[in-house]
Amino acid sequence: MAAEAAPEWVEKGDNAWPLAAATLVGLQSVPRLVILYGDCGAVGPRTEKDREAFPPNNVLLTLAGAGLLLWMGWTGFNGGAPYAANVDASVTVVNTHLCTATSLLVWLLLDSFVFGRLSVISAVQGMITGLVCVTPAARLVLHKRSRLLARVDDTLAVLHTHGVAGSLSGVLTGLLLLAEPRFARLFFGDDPRYVGLAYAVRDGRAGSGLRQVGVQLAGIAFVVALNVAVTSAVCLAVRVAVPQLAGGGDAIHGEDAYAVWGDGETYEQYSVHGGGSNHGGFPMTANPVASKADEMIWI
């Protein structure tokens, strides 16, 4: 059933099950990501120099914004969608926090296996993935219950946090684990059409279950197609050539907006001051001038 937060025309469709217009919110970024950053001919990826290293500017602000604003704010986003303090809202809030916490922990666990360390940025990505994934089905979750991607210049890691999670949750809402018939009747009444596929097969109503899965897929496809068309129309007009991309602050002024280097890295004069690589580099703090000055003093 379309949520009250969705546009009016959504209510007149075949009633896919997103809570809080989650299909629109969660999936709009997918085609925009592909068009803006993907290697698909619209705008193109960033320059190689920009892709070599792009550390976060401020991890503490990222953590504060994600935890205090996004996670806590999502409580109101999902929990407020029913527009009432009722069973819908309470179940939604509980499911939202459970899914988000689980996704964060799983992401950190995988991070430790693959990279051998735990990362704050990875924790934030896992948290956002959980928030996105649970949103379409937040009030329907029963508690007991690539090579292609490597070519996408996903600067903000949107494809897996929004695209995969949003699509997966939208499909699973009508497919396997969600919408147990007795539980779904609390929200949708006794309409026999609204049943998850797994439960429909069990009850001998496979047709109704397949119909609901088809509706979920159609809703996802519509949102993606709409955004690909609209975003392409906007972005094709603003595409620029690689030489123009290089004409930013680094090329014109010989400096970056945020001159922050990590421990143990070196500041290559060639990169911003036009010197050759034979000039070598020197250990950097947040202030390259101060580092060089300290070196000169100790000499």
Curated annotation (Swiss-Prot):
Keywords: Membrane, Transmembrane, Transmembrane helix. It is a multi-pass membrane protein. The chain crosses the membrane at residues 16-36, 59-79, 104-124, 158-178, 218-238. It is found in: Membrane. It holds the Pfam family Ammonium_transp. Gene3D superfamilies: Ammonium transporter AmtB like domains. Its main location: membrane. One of its GO terms (cellular component) is membrane. Belongs to the ammonia transporter channel (TC 1.A.11.2) family. This is Putative ammonium transporter 4 member 1. It comes from Oryza sativa subsp. japonica (Rice). The lineage of its organism: Eukaryota, Viridiplantae, Streptophyta, Embryophyta, Tracheophyta. The gene is AMT4-1.
